């Protein structure tokens, strides 16, 4: 009998423990990374970065029809179930205006990353179309390689280079473009030292040797920015005002609950009409995203009607 993972969205495909036999059949290379736990159960060697990457490759192939997926060394290797949760909760948010989840939604992924994870899940689950922005040439090349290697994705996902590292929406959202939502997994540390300390804690918890590459890796732009998560999201809030009539919902993950009060104050000052917090949980890990709009109920309905 499979044990259920607590807290995942009801539509999340990862409600139960991984069916390792099925995943290994999909991605045979995963077989070499299986271990026995002290309790005698078969598991993946999560302390091995290559094992985590092989697991992601298997999950994306088995559940989301992504037959070719890879990322360069040192980039974030995201936990798929948690990323899927963001997509499903975002779908619920978009469905609240009309009573049904939109089948033709257009989404902007701020910082799509080398892994391209949110568009891959969103296209398969809901048929959405994505624009992914990225400041890193290496990350953008990796994401583009994934898109080109999988049939049909180039029609659903486009990438745009953010030429100004200090900008978020400016230069990415073009005139006369409209998005149902933006999403973002922001950098959460405020310095390289803090990012290294966080990575070291993760390494110790996983029992890795110092020479091991980190499971979830991460480049500078993925892990930290000046002022940390709060400063980054405040910048996003300020910039969102300029695109208040082009985007229905702006959203972003917030890693720590204590970061919410200053963000709520910034949203009030920016004139957000409605602010929503969506709580998520993956096992013992708690997470959340906030969403804000500058449109009232009638304006949101008209936006959707015109866009469709």
Curated annotation (Swiss-Prot):
CC terms in the record's Gene Ontology section: cytoplasm
UniProt KW S-adenosyl-L-methionine keyword: yes
A Pfam family per the record: Methyltransf_10
Domain of life: Bacteria
GO BP, sorted A to Z: rRNA base methylation
Methyltransferase found in the keyword field: yes
EC numbers on record: 2.1.1.181
Subcellular localization(s) per the UniProt record: Cytoplasm
Family matches, as InterPro entries: METTL16/RlmF (IPR010286), rRNA_lsu_MeTfrase_F (IPR016909), SAM-dependent_MTases_sf (IPR029063)
Function: Specifically methylates the adenine in position 1618 of 23S rRNA.
UniProt family annotation: Belongs to the methyltransferase superfamily. METTL16/RlmF family.
Protein name as catalogued: Ribosomal RNA large subunit methyltransferase F
Organism: Salmonella schwarzengrund (strain CVM19633)
